[in-house]
Amino acid sequence: MIEITMWMQSFLQKLNETFASRVWFVGLQGSYGRGEATENSDIDVVVVLDKLSAMDIQTYNIMLDSLLHRELICGFISGKDDIMSWEPSDLFQFCYDTTPIKGSLDEVMALIDESAVNRAIKIGACNIFHGCVHNMLHEKSEDILRGLYKSASFVVQAIVFKHTGNYIKHQKDLLKVTSYDERKIIETFMTLKNGGTVDLNLMSETLFAWSKKWIAKGQ
């Protein structure tokens, strides 16, 4: 598995050489950010520059091509002006799932209010409902179902935050504080994540009913 601390040091060195004082924030998301990475985990790097142009994107791409494990690098890049103008409901997951490496997202987090959290739940539930119905009717894909349960786990994090004011990163910790319906979603997600057996019909019906419930709660 990648020694992420050493890899990030190399990444930061290259980034600073490439963009110098224009680097406003660097962070790590996903399994490496949570300390749950495996050999197959992507490296989800967040970079925010003072501003971002199409030329900057090409420059960043060239920089990434010079790094080890290029095939695993993904993540997000933007300008500060872009992220400060972003849809606040999207910023909820973005900010709380990002481990800072350089700089701070405090200015961005100040944009997240109760309304943004409620919208994160409602929009997430709507998207899951749509994806679930489409998959039940057309694709019938186990991979799509896994992705939908992953998305649902993010919605559960927002639900717990709404009720407690605490953002809980780790799924096993979510199990301790969720109600029965949300616990069932997290348990199923963890089963799928760990390669468990997929019951496409039952798991789809459970997810459909759960997303439908949260859409109605947003009325």
Language model feature labels by segment:
Residues S21, S41:
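Structured loop/turn residues at beta-strand edges in well-structured enzyme cores
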